[in-house]
Amino acid sequence: MAANATTNPSQLLPLELVDKCIGSRIHIVMKSDKEIVGTLLGFDDFVNMVLEDVTEFEITPEGRRITKLDQILLNGNNITMLVPGGEGPEV
């Protein structure tokens, strides 16, 4: 697969896409009933992420809970989907 990426420059690998998102807003859907929106500061090979200016949306039995956080370290094991430039669920 890596050889194919070098012969086709228009192909973008997953970690390259995440790398292009550094410094911009990203919407993250988690395996649990949480969604997170924040500015991506950095990530590692396991897609653990450091985010700032974070809003966490969580579905609870009482309804939707919204939490604002300055900075977080997010474990990549719990990520289902990344949306570059996403603004999160409608409130």
Swiss-Prot record:
Primary localization class, coarse: nucleus
Signal peptide interval: none
GO cellular component, one term: cytosol
Keyword check for ATP-binding: no
SMART domains: Sm
Annotated ranges, domain Sm: 13-88
Annotated InterPro entries: LSm5, LSM_dom_sf, Sm, Sm_dom_euk/arc
Keyword Endoplasmic reticulum carried by entry: no
Top-level division of the source organism's lineage: Eukaryota
Single GO BP term: mRNA catabolic process
Gene Ontology molecular function: protein heterodimerization activity; RNA binding
Subunit structure, interactors included: Component of the precatalytic spliceosome (spliceosome B complex). Component of the U4/U6-U5 tri-snRNP complex, a building block of the precatalytic spliceosome (spliceosome B complex). The U4/U6-U5 tri-snRNP complex is composed of the U4, U6 and U5 snRNAs and at least PRPF3, PRPF4, PRPF6, PRPF8, PRPF31, SNRNP200, TXNL4A, SNRNP40, SNRPB, SNRPD1, SNRPD2, SNRPD3, SNRPE, SNRPF, SNRPG, DDX23, CD2BP2, PPIH, SNU13, EFTUD2, SART1 and USP39, plus LSM2, LSM3, LSM4, LSM5, LSM6, LSM7 and LSM8.
Family: Belongs to the snRNP Sm proteins family.
Record-given protein name: U6 snRNA-associated Sm-like protein LSm5
Source organism of this protein record: Homo sapiens
